[in-house]
Amino acid sequence: MTSLVEGTLVVVSAHSADFVWRAGGAIAAHTAQGGRAHVICLSYGERGESAKLWRSPGMTLEAVKAARQEEATHAAEALGAEVSFFDAGDYPLPPAEQLVERLASELRVLAPGAILTHAAYDPYNTDHSDAYRITLQGRMVAQAHGFQPEDGAVLGAPPVFVFEPHQPEVCEFRPDLLLDITEVFPQKRKAMECMAAQEHLWRYYTDLAERRGVQAVRNSGNKAIVHAEAYQRVFPTVASGLS
């Protein structure tokens, strides 16, 4: 199994659990080979993705946020990743201009070798679409010589991959990379089980990894693959050969 990228893998997640379901395998594969992975959660998903917690008597917004932060922190640890929280609020995320420069500053510091984030179009959850735009704008601003010129750390051109949305057919998602996560799927499953507020998704994303694994075998001939994750490139890949 090969990791996705050389250098730091940065994952921009709209809510505190998104990175687990959709990119947990890539994160674990990268860190298993000694790579660094850093997850940026724009929000905790406290309003829109924590229904189970809100059913508890006397629950408050701050208590939900604390629970979601604890879950995501444990999940990141299971994947071998660092995690930071912008606490921007969700449903909806705030306007992009409130987050873009903060993200750009983080990208300058992290100097990612690749970035993973949401698909461009998700009519079911526009926070995901907004996270995509915030990510691309943050990358663009971090590349600008006139942004914080005093730090002298202009970002290069890290590739961006979008991970699979919950309803790919409706979100115009067309995978062009199937990543073998067979060896690290136990870590992904452990991370999923940290997200107790969304226990109903554990089985769904286990099944999805198996289905993508079948497709990976079909597309590679490698019958050892059992689990995979699907990604779509945003920018062309630059290579010296066809493979």
Model-found features: residue ranges?
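Metal-dependent de-N-acetylase/amidase catalytic core
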Residues: 1-12, 33, 82, 93-243
